Amino acid sequence: MVRRSVTLPQLQAKKALGEPITMLTAWDYLWARLLDAAGVDVILVGDSLGMVALGYPTTLPVTLDQMIHHAQAVRRGVSHSFLVCDLPFLSYQESPEQALRSAGRLIKEAEVQAVKMEGASPVVQAATRRLVEAGIPVLGHVGLLPQRVHQLGGWRQQGNTPQDAAAILAGALALAEAGVFAVILEHIPAALAQQITAQLKIPTIGIGAGPHCDGQVLVTADVLGLSPQVPPFAKVYADLGTQAIAAIENYCQAVKSRQFP
């Protein structure tokens, strides 16, 4: 069977069809090629690459130029998956026009197909409208917002009070009204995610938000056992970190003992 490229209308249609959307992150050509070959629906060049690939403690130091650099590498490894890229911290919060310039660079220079912004503030809502008007698809993101980690006091679950839950629901509805094609629900109670999913016509993609979303996303390094610390909501499907260290140790020993080459 010939595999076709994933399109935005196909992703949105999956909600009505009851077909869960799969999404994982990539930060270079190697991982993009592997995810694409595995049939992942959506590949996200997340600003989590700041922590996974660049060694920062948070996503905040990542620049737009760095995102473009990594997205260009990912683009070269993608043949079929739909490609989305994060707008990093302070590349869109100033104004809708700043967001348009930043997103435009990702579209033109890295050939991504959509961008993601965090939160549902008035500026983000206005920026979403501006980007959609310009023909740039936007993925929303509510709940735990990594770009606000200091403001939130860490990587804690959000939406645990009635007021916070109502604000997250209102934010998701506002983003849908502004024109996002889907919304990520990060680290919120499963019941809240279920409520949001039921009220939205667009797909919801969960990360630590329970089983009721229209799709799921995780950081690939967490899935493959490559992260030193894995979030409590993630599942490790392979321990590649341990296997890689063992393989490298075997290589070094073989060289030192002159068993290789």
Swiss-Prot record:
Main location: cytoplasm
Pathway annotation: Cofactor biosynthesis; (R)-pantothenate biosynthesis; (R)-pantoate from 3-methyl-2-oxobutanoate: step 1/2
Catalytic activity: 3-methyl-2-oxobutanoate + (6R)-5,10-methylene-5,6,7,8-tetrahydrofolate + H2O = 2-dehydropantoate + (6S)-5,6,7,8-tetrahydrofolate
Coiled-coil parts of chain: none
GO CC terms, sorted: cytoplasm
Cofactor annotation comment: Binds 1 Mg(2+) ion per subunit.
Binding site for Mg(2+): 47, 86, 118
Family, similarity comment: Belongs to the PanB family.
The protein's name: 3-methyl-2-oxobutanoate hydroxymethyltransferase
Organism: Thermosynechococcus vestitus (strain NIES-2133 / IAM M-273 / BP-1)
